[in-house]
């Protein structure tokens, strides 16, 4: 049966409304072509409102970067999906228009992120990741679309069986003509060394960045293209999904956006299995002049965008500035260090505390005994409480105060009497002297 490129009818215009706008300024577009063909239900009122006001799409879209599709791995992948001849038992062949439709379906337009199916050796792979608008959450849906297309193509390829090298070479040449026009956008890419001073991939040996004009087709890519077209074994392994990391789905990305406020991005890493290395090191691999083609492994990584949800209520949690937070952390560390120093010798500290408590108890007992004896002595000096052994301390203090005041008053009275008596004595002495002088 011939290779069927068409998929189930899905309204991708509604699924990818963040990527494709509903209308263009000063241009009449058929926005509801599926509705006119199948006479489905009328469009949503939101779409009529957008069409009524004819607003420009915001935010603006980024320029399309399709130079990554010209990599040898992608050309080899397309060569593996080439149609069969009538004599191979396939049931028919495709014309040039069908091949063009296949390429258009495989490319997927702006709905497919080109960083999924490009070769990591190509310099435009890094540029695609840098320039692609990841804030509109188009990666998860694009990854799902690519996985569905590749699964259908691989199923059709397995049903088709083996293909002739001549037919694969013609398909590669045709696809290279279609893909060569896409390399013009590579000159408009930004050099990743300007944006990221450090390398983005985990390769041990850094590779010098090539000029944007030379990233479309290099001599190494031409040799890989010719070898991929001539060798029938190079076609079945252009793109391999890692077993530990399943392809990203839209539900997974939505959950991770709600929990971690991060967007999933699929990065391509080049890995060579040990079986391939053993085959390349064996002498039987001398017949093949090219090195074994390394599979592409899709892995998931997280790119933090730090998006702010303006619709959410203001948080009541107080965020400290970095300097104040550093001071608080340093204070906590110092407090922990002081506590550790205090608890360095627990036995010695316990003995010291027991000794201090014992001496304190002894001194407190002595103080209480002295105070009790003082109250007893004061009670004995008061005539009213002299024989009252159960007199409280308050009564002792009050009676002692009254007794002291009475004694002070009596003292003042006695002092005044003493002064009068002294004066009387002086007068009597003076009178005695006068009498002695008169008698003489």
Curated annotation (Swiss-Prot):
Q: Where is carbohydrate linked to this protein?
A: 58
Sequence segments annotated as region (Disordered): 202-362
Query: Can you provide one Gene Ontology molecular function annotated for this UniProt record?
Result: E-box binding
Q: Tell me where in this chain the PTM Phosphoserine is found.
A: 6, 62, 71, 82, 152, 162, 294, 315, 330, 345, 348-349
Composition bias type Low complexity, residue spans: 210-239, 280-289
- The residue ranges flagged as biased composition, category Acidic residues, are 252-264
Q: Which residues form the bHLH domain?
A: 355-407
Report residues of the Glycyl lysine isopeptide (Lys-Gly) (interchain with G-Cter in SUMO2) crosslink.
52, 144, 149, 299
Post-translational modification note = Phosphorylated by PRKDC. Phosphorylation at Ser-330 by PIM2 leads to the stabilization of MYC. Phosphorylation at Ser-62 by CDK2 prevents Ras-induced senescence. Phosphorylated at Ser-62 by DYRK2; this primes the protein for subsequent phosphorylation by GSK3B at Thr-58. Phosphorylation at Thr-58 and Ser-62 by GSK3 is required for ubiquitination and degradation by the proteasome. Dephosphorylation at multiple sites by the PNUTS-PP1 complex promotes MYC stability by preventing ubiquitination by the SCF(FBXW7) complex. Ubiquitinated by the SCF(FBXW7) complex when phosphorylated at Thr-58 and Ser-62, leading to its degradation by the proteasome. Ubiquitination is counteracted by USP28 in the nucleoplasm and USP36 in the nucleolus, both interacting with of FBXW7, leading to its deubiquitination and preventing degradation. Also polyubiquitinated by the DCX(TRPC4AP) complex. Ubiquitinated by UBR5 when not forming a heterodimer with another bHLH protein, leading to its degradation: UBR5 recognizes and binds a degron that is only available upon heterodimer dissociation.
Sequence positions bearing Phosphothreonine: 58, 316
Q: Which GO terms describe its biological process?
A: chromatin remodeling; chromosome organization; DNA damage response; G1/S transition of mitotic cell cycle; intracellular iron ion homeostasis; MAPK cascade; negative regulation of cell division; negative regulation of monocyte differentiation
Q: Where is this region: Leucine-zipper?
A: 414-435
- Which residues lie in Basic and acidic residues bias regions? 267-279, 316-332
Residue window of motif 9aaTAD: 101-109
Location relative to the cell? Nucleus, Nucleoplasm; Nucleus, Nucleolus; Nucleus; Cytoplasm
Q: Which GO terms describe its cellular component?
A: cytoplasm; nucleolus; nucleoplasm
Cited InterPro entries = bHLH_dom, HLH_DNA-bd_sf, Myc-LZ, Myc_transcription_factors, Tscrpt_reg_Myc, Tscrpt_reg_Myc_N
Motif (UBR5-degron) on chain: 356-365
Residues annotated with N6-acetyllysine modification: 144, 149, 158, 276, 318, 324, 372
Extent of Polar residues compositional bias:
336-348
Ubl conjugation found in the keyword field: yes
Role noted for this protein: Transcription factor that binds DNA in a non-specific manner, yet also specifically recognizes the core sequence 5'-CAC[GA]TG-3'. Activates the transcription of growth-related genes. Binds to the VEGFA promoter, promoting VEGFA production and subsequent sprouting angiogenesis. Regulator of somatic reprogramming, controls self-renewal of embryonic stem cells. Functions with TAF6L to activate target gene expression through RNA polymerase II pause release.
Q: What is known of its domains?
A: The 9aaTAD motif is a transactivation domain present in a large number of yeast and animal transcription factors.
Quaternary structure note:
Efficient DNA binding requires dimerization with another bHLH protein. Binds DNA as a heterodimer with MAX. Interacts with TAF1C and SPAG9. Interacts with PARP10. Interacts with KDM5A and KDM5B. Interacts (when phosphorylated at Thr-58 and Ser-62) with FBXW7. Interacts with PIM2. Interacts with RIOX1. The heterodimer MYC:MAX interacts with ABI1; the interaction may enhance MYC:MAX transcriptional activity. Interacts with TRIM6. Interacts with NPM1; the binary complex is recruited to the promoter of MYC target genes and enhances their transcription. Interacts with NUP205.
Question: What is the name listed in the Swiss-Prot or TrEMBL entry for this protein?
Answer: Myc proto-oncogene protein
Q: What's the source species' lineage?
A: Eukaryota, Metazoa, Chordata, Craniata, Vertebrata
Corresponding gene? MYC
């Amino acid at each position: 049966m011939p290779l069927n490129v068409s998929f189930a009818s899905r309204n991708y215009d509604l699924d990818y409304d963040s990527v494709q706008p509903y209308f263009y300024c000063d241009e009449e577009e058929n926005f509801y072509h599926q509705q006119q063909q199948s006479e489905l239900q009328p469009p949503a009122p939101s779409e009529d409102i957008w069409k009524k006001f004819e607003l420009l799409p915001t935010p603006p879209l980024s320029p399309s970067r399709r130079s990554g599709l010209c990599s040898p791995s992608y050309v080899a992948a397309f060569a593996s999906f080439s149609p069969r001849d009538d004599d191979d038992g396939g049931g028919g062949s495709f014309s040039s228009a069908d091949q063009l439709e296949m390429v258009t379906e495989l490319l997927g337009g702006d709905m497919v992120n080109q960083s999924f199916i490009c070769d990591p050796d190509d310099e435009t792979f890094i540029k695609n990741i840098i320039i692609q608008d990841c804030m509109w959450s188009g990666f998860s849906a694009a990854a799902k679309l690519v996985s569905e297309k590749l699964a259908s193509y691989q199923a059709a390829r397995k049903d088709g069986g083996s293909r002739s090298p001549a037919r694969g070479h013609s398909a590669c040449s045709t696809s290279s003509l279609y893909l060569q026009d896409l390399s013009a956008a590579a000159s408009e890419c930004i050099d990743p060394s300007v944006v990221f001073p450090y390398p983005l991939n985990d390769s041990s040996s850094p590779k010098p960045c090539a000029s944007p004009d030379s990233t479309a087709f290099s001599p190494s890519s031409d040799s890989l293209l010719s070898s991929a077209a001539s060798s029938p074994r190079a076609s079945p392994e252009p793109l391999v999904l890692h077993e530990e990391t399943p392809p990203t789905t839209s539900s997974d990305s939505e959950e991770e956006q709600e929990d971690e406020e991060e967007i999933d991005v699929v990065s391509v890493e080049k890995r060579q299995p040990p079986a391939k290395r053993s085959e390349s090191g064996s002498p039987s691999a001398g017949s093949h002049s090219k090195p074994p083609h390394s599979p592409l492994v899709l892995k998931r990584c997280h790119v933090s965008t730090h998006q702010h949800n303006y619709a959410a209520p203001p948080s009541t949690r107080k965020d400290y500035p970095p300097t104040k937070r550093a001071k608080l952390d340093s204070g906590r560390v110092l407090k922990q260090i002081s506590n550790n120093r205090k608890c360095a010798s627990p036995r010695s500290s316990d003995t010291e505390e027991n000794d201090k408590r014992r001496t304190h108890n002894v001194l407190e007992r002595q103080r209480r005994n002295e105070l009790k004896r003082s109250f007893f002595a004061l009670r004995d000096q008061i005539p009213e409480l002299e024989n009252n052994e159960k007199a409280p301390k308050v009564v002792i203090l009050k009676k002692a105060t009254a007794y002291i005041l009475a004694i002070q008053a009596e003292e003042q009275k006695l002092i005044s009497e003493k002064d009068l008596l002294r004066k009387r004595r002086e007068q009597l002495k003076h009178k005695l002297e006068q009498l002695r002088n008169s008698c003489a």
